[in-house]
Amino acid sequence: MGIQGLLQFLKEASEPVHVKKYKGKTVAVDTYCWLHKGAFACAEKLAKGEPTDQYVQFCMKLVHMLLSFGVKPILVFDGCTLPSKKDVEKARREKRQTNLQKGKQLLREGKLAEARECFSRSVNITSSMAHEVIKAARSEGVDYIVAPYEADSQLAYLNKNDFAEAIITEDSDLLAFGCKKVLLKMDKFGNGLEIDQARFGMCRSLGDVFTEEKFRYMCILSGCDYLPSIHGIGLAKACKLLKVANNPDITKVIQKIGQYLKTNITVPEGYIEGFLRANNTFLYQLVFDPVERKLIPLNPYGNDVNPEELNYAGPNMGDSVALQIALGNMDINTRKQIDDYNPDIPQLSHHRSQSWDNKQLNRKTAHTDSIWYTKSEPCKTTKIEEIHSPRGLILPSKKHTVKRSYEDGVSDTDLISQYSFSKNKKARPDGDDPMQQVPASTMILQPLDDCANTKPKKPIHQPKTRNAFATFLQRQKQDCSSVSATGTRSRFFYKPADEKPHCTEKEQIVCNGSALDIAKETHELTEESSIKTEKEDSLSTISEVCKPNNQRISPLQNQRSCFTWSGSLDSESSPTPKQSPMLLSLQKFHRTTPYMQNEAENKPSWQSSCIKSDTVSQIDSNEKLLKKQDIEDTDSDEHASTPESPCQFTMKASPAHQSFFPEPKGSAPKSKVPGLLKSQSVVSGLRTKVKPRAPAKVSGLTNRSNTKATRNNENVPGLQATIGDLWKNFSYKK
């Protein structure tokens, strides 16, 4: 069936597509191809004569698939046998009868597999089987038409006259009839191979010189249902012949076919007449116009064509008979009345429900947009989705369709309100400080207005922010924006006027590598006004707060600090602010160390704390080393302190490692602060001995101590090497 090798020959013009490409449009279907596929599943029952409707279910399943994608199908069935195909139909009938007899014989012998194969080849689609599919399509409001003769010519007419956008078939003869778009090899999912006539120029074998007429000649020469081919002539040689021959008369080209192809090919007698009959059959085969409801040729007759001589293309049976055949009311073989369907009478169709929102659409009558309706337009390719809406397709209509609401679901209004800003939201005043909204528990160090004033302010209850820690870091970044990113600053060019009183706040500490922010409330303690009064106090405070006008705290000091003060040593100090419940729950994990005092030397001993520690022995060894270094640094810093600045201490090391502040040498023994251990990362970084800082230089660098007494000094002549000494050291002995 069809033209052998044509699909492979037009491979470059084909394109794999899905049927949803034609959503909202109308397609015509060669239903006999579907009937043959559906009959294969029940071939054994059909051969035995058992009743079955599997082929009907198969065809309607494909119809429902097209409707689900918004495609309106028109089912086209074959009619009477065409006189031009009597020989072909006779040969096919004999072949089917032979396979049927062979299958019955194999079934008697018990060879079931071979018998089924023979039965599948012997399937004959009868008019009664087609009528069962017609009744099923009619009940669901699907358009159909029975061709007066062949379905191929009727499909081509529907496509050329814009009744259908494309043709769904398995027969390649549709291309020879001049169809614009043909969808071949479509499966049950809607995938197929589309061949568009507009893409024929992409085929290298055809070239740009081929026209629709030459393409039809090529198909006839290569062999079709109306005329067998000449021995040795296929699509390739037929295409080559039409490219080489310049004579417009095709009969003369066929006579000289051997000269054009340079082969010894003889044209059989009667071949030219058969060629002309086949060409006229492709052009003037009778079809039925559903709008005018009469028989017409596929293409208008030419001036040199006599319709009475074209009986081989289908004799004129009359418009009334053709109408009854087209409606499926008359048997095509016996011409007996088998049904009384009238498309002009509105009938209630039982559509298959595709979704929840198209039940009302299914109640529409079938004749409203049918091709049989006399007031309908020929083109039915627009707005077809209003009749058969696919699953989930939102159709434009005045009525608002309401979907089923899910239980415990969020409505669309609530969902939109979650992603939109409220219009009644009050704007924050310009004077509001984002730091005021940060709870007191997030403040590591609280700034003090005066060193002597140690009374903490009452925490102000502020509404909880979305991310207080992010606000805190943003405020700290703005306050410390003038500080160098590396934390280094020349002490020579330093001016007290550049100091800002803030930047004393620290970030929260994340210990043990977790995301838990442990915020501990601390007190800023100050020292007494002079060194003499400090010696008389029984307790002194440990602070890292200095006067803002005299000394600037390095930003690296705030960033590298891994501990905070957790209590007060002064009995006269104000009470500790109320801790948060989170801190109270974590207080049981607070680690404390025994007091360490050195009464013999009355020197302060320092003790650090860290929540994350590997071993206790490593921390104790580092504490002893730091204790010894701090005592030595205290002795060197005692001479540098003056009565004018009693609270100011000289920084012992670089700002990156500054975490301890010494007290004057003559101070009374201090009580130890429990639970203050330095983190291991900081302690491990101070393994080398911290040297006391020398007086400030212009370059801002510390002066290294002169370890060698014999070092050359250019300012002292006695220590310089003279030329005579050099000659003595490097002279050779005689």
Curated annotation (Swiss-Prot):
GO terms assigned for molecular function: 5'-3' DNA exonuclease activity; 5'-flap endonuclease activity; DNA binding; flap endonuclease activity; metal ion binding; single-stranded DNA 5'-3' DNA exonuclease activity
Respond yes or no to whether keyword Amino-acid biosynthesis is given for this record.
no
Q: Name one GO cellular component term.
A: nucleus
Where does it reside? Nucleus
Ranges of biased composition (kind: Polar residues): 604-620, 700-715
Q: Which PANTHER family match?
A: EXONUCLEASE 1 (PTHR11081:SF8), FLAP ENDONUCLEASE FAMILY MEMBER (PTHR11081)
Which E.C. number(s) belong to this protein? 3.1.-.-
Keyword annotations of the record: DNA damage, DNA excision, DNA repair, DNA-binding, Endonuclease, Excision nuclease, Exonuclease, Hydrolase, Magnesium, Metal-binding, Nuclease, Nucleus
For the region Disordered, give the residue spans: 599-650, 656-675, 685-716
Output this protein's name: Exonuclease 1
Q: Which residues lie in Basic and acidic residues bias regions?
A: 621-641
The record's region (I-domain) falls at: 138-229
* Cofactor(s) it depends on: Mg(2+)
In residue numbers, the region (N-domain) covers: 1-99
Gene Ontology biological process terms, A to Z: DNA recombination; mismatch repair
Please report the organism this UniProt entry assigns to the protein: Xenopus laevis
Where mainly located?
nucleus
Per UniProt, where does Mg(2+) 2 bind? D171, D173, D225
Q: Which residues bind Mg(2+) 1?
A: D30, D78, E150, D152
Q: What does the UniProt cofactor note say? A: Binds 2 magnesium ions per subunit. They probably participate in the reaction catalyzed by the enzyme. May bind an additional third magnesium ion after substrate binding.
Family designation? Belongs to the XPG/RAD2 endonuclease family. EXO1 subfamily.
Q: Name one Pfam family in it.
A: XPG_N
Q: Disulfide bond: present as a keyword of the record? A: no
* Coiled coil ranges: none
Protein role: 5'->3' double-stranded DNA exonuclease which may also contain a cryptic 3'->5' double-stranded DNA exonuclease activity. Also exhibits endonuclease activity against 5'-overhanging flap structures similar to those generated by displacement synthesis when DNA polymerase encounters the 5'-end of a downstream Okazaki fragment. Required for DNA mismatch repair (MMR).
